[in-house]
Amino acid sequence: MASFFARTRRFSLVSLFLLELFTINLIPTTDAQIGICYGMMGNNLPPANEVIALYKANNIKRMRLYDPNQPALNALRDSGIELILGIPNSDLQTLATNQDSARQWVQRNVLNFYPSVKIKYIAVGNEVSPVGGSSWLAQYVLPATQNVYQAIRAQGLHDQIKVTTAIDMTLIGNSFPPSKGSFRSDVRSYLDPFIGYLVYAGAPLLVNVYPYFSHIGNPRDISLPYALFTSPGVMVQDGPNGYQNLFDAMLDSVHAALDNTGIGWVNVVVSESGWPSDGGSATSYDNARIYLDNLIRHVGKGTPRRPWATEAYLFAMFDENQKSPELEKHFGVFYPNKQKKYPFGFGGERRDGEIVEGDFNGTVSLKSDM
């Protein structure tokens, strides 16, 4: 494993282009690429077995679990739901410095459940940044990931279960135009070796993408319709690619940043995206409904740079009354009483700028420590 980065070839721009063309034929273009993040920071939420029954009742086929919550893992047995299984940031140091701890973690939380629980990815940490409040943890992300990967590989499961991490958009230094996307220079020493690992392991990078926060951070230059997928036409022309919504522009800036490292081709999974219905600037029921509905129906189309279906996870399953600040309490797609907050669904048609309501059909992720 120590030689994985040395074995990663630097791709020319032509090689990257040809590899993306080849990959288009490998990635399924289905409309069932949506997940929903389910958090547990509330004192009025249903137990895990009822929540998973709610997924099944709504034909929800994917989930993100941010830590190995044992009641949830047990309830997931034979459910057919694909899972992103998370490792909390608090466990990174132990797993990075002790291979036996990584093997024990895999035995306890993966082998004890797989394959009756359909674990698809293991997310080693969430939003760790070498320049943020979690900077002291950055040194542990890659070695923890390598140790978990080695434990998975020893069981012959490295092709079935991909080991990765989740980042946020603060690691992007330039995002405009999207084709010029690049990572911040002060995070390259952290990210480049990790990207090399992803190329070696054939694993995707998980990225949390929130047009909401980009809009409220710069409402003068980023309009609300652009953030909500409701712009009447192309807002950003970037060479041959036209951008009518902010989500595509943000995601393609990540694609470009990865490509522009020259390390190799990496797929991206959107591990969080959402819009709060209350508690802050530009928050309303209608804004949240429109964003979520449009995102659900949009991801099957992909982005201008990568025009195949995007795997994405909405945030969040429930409104969580123990989160802060106030807007963080209002990202839910369902109320804590298990009633739908929004009537959106797949396959709807927009009429005169309105969202046509449809049956909910998506994917859920469990979030218990964020």
UniProtKB/Swiss-Prot annotation:
One Pfam family linked to the record: Glyco_hydro_17
EC number: 3.2.1.39
Pyrrolidone carboxylic acid sites (modified residues): Q33
SUPFAM superfamilies per UniProt: (Trans)glycosidases
UniProt keyword tRNA processing present: no
Reaction(s) the record says it catalyses: Hydrolysis of (1->3)-beta-D-glucosidic linkages in (1->3)-beta-D-glucans
Annotated TM spans: none
Tissue-specific expression: Constitutively expressed in seedling roots.
Broadest EC class assigned to this enzyme: hydrolase
InterPro entries listed in its UniProt record: Glyco_hydro_17, Glyco_hydro_17_plant, Glycoside_hydrolase_SF
Catalytic residues of the enzyme: E127, E272
Signal peptide (UniProt feature, chain positions): 1-32
GO molecular function, one term: glucan endo-1,3-beta-D-glucosidase activity
Propeptide: 348-370
GO biological process terms held by the UniProt record: carbohydrate metabolic process; defense response
Stated induction or repression of this protein's expression: By fungal elicitors.
Coiled-coil regions listed: none
Keywords: Glycoprotein, Glycosidase, Hydrolase, Plant defense, Pyrrolidone carboxylic acid, Signal
Glycosylation sites: N361
Function: Implicated in the defense of plants against pathogens.
PANTHER family for this protein: GLUCAN ENDO-1,3-BETA-GLUCOSIDASE BG1-RELATED-RELATED (PTHR32227)
Family from the record: Belongs to the glycosyl hydrolase 17 family.
UniProt-recorded name of the protein: Glucan endo-1,3-beta-glucosidase
The species this protein was found in: Pisum sativum (Garden pea)
